[in-house]
Amino acid sequence: MELKIGRAIIKKGLEVLYEYSDVDVAIVGAGPSGLTAARYLAEKGFKVLVFERRFSFGGGIGPGGNMLPSIVVQEEALPILRDFKVRYQPAGDGLYTVDPAELIAKLAAGAIDAGAKIILGVHVDDVIFRGDPPRVAGLLWIWTPIQMSGMHVDPLYTMAKAVIDATGHDAEVISVAARKVPELGIQLPGEKSAWSEVSEKLVVEYTGKVAPGLYVTGMAVAAVHGLPRMGPIFGGMMLSGKKIAEIVAKDLAEEAYALRA
């Protein structure tokens, strides 16, 4: 029995890694913006892979309300909540409360049911680039426990037509790209202190392409563009995820058309 269990895990696990070594879109971070983007891109028929460094979904949703079992979204994000069948309760002044556990579960299920693949426990170590001027063309990754151990282990590769940084406050993928491929011309001022009303609008407004092949969504937008943080309100995160899905889908469709022309 043990032999059959082990072989089944090894066979299927390696098949998954092989199949997803080349994708349309690689999203780094399974938080609210990353999962939202994954669902809307997968629904459009793109091959979507999400890498998450933890062994759980949700990013900052779970502890978001200072560990209380409630978080807030604003009215503009309600259509997304309805898409994912997430329940919400009015809290006044255009704000609504949501159960963080329900939001985590349904964002993840929505992305998976739409066809996105999520691989947990992965640390993205670097980017792949091509061309002059350069374009981001994929990711280098290792398992998170290896990265945490400090041992030197060479990473594996995933090629992608588009890479989305949804890693949150530190914009980890874009930070690496800015440091190691300076020809991309990326500046990273870091996020500012809290101003929730302004940040919720600006994070969505500034969501988009950072460099050829490289995109940003969610709190990473604040780090890249020097915007204020917002705290435990999550509507902007989901709106940013939906917007980046629309931008990437449009760019990939235009690139595919150009190749056929």
UniProtKB/Swiss-Prot annotation:
Tell me the residue numbers annotated for binding Fe cation: 154, 169
Is the keyword NAD in the record? yes
Q: Where, in this chain's numbering, is glycine bound?
A: 229
Needed cofactors: Fe(2+)
Task: For this UniProt record, give its keywords in alphabetical order, as a comma-separated list.
Answer: Iron, Metal-binding, NAD, Thiamine biosynthesis, Transferase
Give GO terms for biological process. Answer: thiamine biosynthetic process; thiamine diphosphate biosynthetic process; thiazole biosynthetic process
The catalytic activity, as recorded, is: hydrogen sulfide + glycine + NAD(+) = ADP-5-ethyl-4-methylthiazole-2-carboxylate + nicotinamide + 3 H2O + H(+)
Q: How does it assemble?
A: Homooctamer; tetramer of dimers.
What name has this protein been given in UniProt?
Answer: Thiamine thiazole synthase
